[in-house]
């Protein structure tokens, strides 16, 4: 097993069998030193399972979670790991435009199922996603058997609000007030629709932009990121 940068966690790549029979996809597995804990699926941004996503997984492993980060672009190209240069942004949007959302949620369900079967997992599993993964976290709450879902600056949630009536788990959404990918009108629509459901919380961070929780990112906003993290951890521990 590979040691990552944290002495208190271990990590390696594993394979997950897709339930539609189309093959296997990779996932980054990070475990706490104890090897035991609740499960957490990290749903990627549009840049693939890159260094940022793996670092987030390692961080939550340090917090005591067994974490899986599935390669959700595998049906287009396995192993996508992009940076944040203009060229990488262009490639990322191409993958995003070619992404099948329904199959992505199916892959997340397969990841949840796999995670529950990993030795040391308590059986409780959450989904936490960013950007593209933020919407997938919301859809996971609507369509999968996850125990809690947390979405950071999800894109397009306002177009899937009818599915909210199917949510049976805890859901927390973190919205960046300055996010051009989720403008004010969309934010209001989300708050109005989801605000009437118990156990569904929508938080708007007025001074934050898209990707405000990505450390070292252009739009990283520490006060908002810390507050969102505290709320996320609280929801995961309920």
Question: How would you describe each model-predicted region?
Answer:
Residues 1-238:
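N-terminal cap/leader regions of alpha/beta-hydrolase-fold enzymes
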